[in-house]
Amino acid sequence: MCTAATYQTKDFYFGRTLDYEFSYGDEIVVTPRKFPLDFCHMGKCDAHYGMIGMAHVADGYPLYYDAVNEKGVGMAGLNFVGNAVYQKVEEGRENVAQYELIPWVLGQCANLQEVRKLLAKMNLVGTPFGDFPAAQLHWIIADASGAITLECTKDGLQVYDNPAGVLTNNPPFPMQMFQLNNYAGLSPKQPEHRFSGQIPFTSYSRGMGAMGLPGDLSSESRFARVAFVKCNSVSGDSEKESVSQFFHILGSVDQQRGCCEVAEGKYEITIYTSCCNASKGIYYYTTYDNHQISAVDMHRTDLDSKTLSCDKPGMEEQLFCQN
């Protein structure tokens, strides 16, 4: 269970929450331009765009959850269990395994238009990485011009325009967008009294214009809530204001330990939240036990290196004592 969002002020921001009951040992990973990407069916790529994101590095290969490349294109994979159906390897097609899709796209595409052209030629297959099972995912891909959602189901590969600029999990994206119709009457303003002129109404609280906005942790509810918060969000253009506001947006769907039990004594939590300034290549993050916003700047690493640059996220809470 995860949530991803885009945000535009002076710069373009892209990020997500990763909600799960355990971590694989994630790291902030910079894949430099000359790091050899060995694709399962497409051979080796020795030169590509640099990228930064959160990944689990297995056998020297970055398995990205989310990433942004040096051109400002962002991409995140989110659970899509029960609906993701990958295709079979076909001779003569550009067969790309689901685990390598993020570096495949971000390594080649400088903008969303190029992404669309690349996806039109691609055959997305379910080849697993080593002993890992093939993760059932769908993806949000975005730049400053807009966002798309990529889903591979029993009906084949689908690319959807994503005007909301958000994504969660099930149900499929068209259903998520359709259910937003249920909230067309919501507003950040106080509601007008239209029930009846015969009954006196009192607005007894602020925020009543958004009554009916779902507050539970299901993926459909999180989609509606983060879309409302993101689309009505107001922020200054500075880096501090923009980054702070982005974390507030995704904070609206934070998962607290104890509220989503997945097995006896096991709870889904927001393991990390990311916010990448895609325009500048700066990856900000917080973790469940460390709310201090930390940053890794892609351009402070050697982007012409052949070696991954990995930083372990800070996991211990930082408390500032004022006296």
Model-based region annotation:
Residues 1-93, 121, 126, 311-313, ...:
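A contiguous strand-loop segment
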Residues 92-127, 239-247:
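Proteins synthesized as precursors that undergo proteolytic processing into mature forms
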Residues 121-158:
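Catalytic cofactor-binding cores of redox enzymes
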Residues 20-22, 81-83, 155-158, 165, ...:
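Short, surface-exposed beta-strand-loop junctions and turns on beta-sheet-rich folds
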Residues 1-13, 118, 129, 134-135, ...:
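C-terminus-biased signal that marks the final domain/tail of proteins
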Residues 68, 148-152, 274:
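Broad, structure-driven detector of short, well-ordered beta-strand segments within folded domains
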Residues 18, 79, 143-145, 154, ...:
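Short, flexible loop/turn elements at secondary-structure junctions
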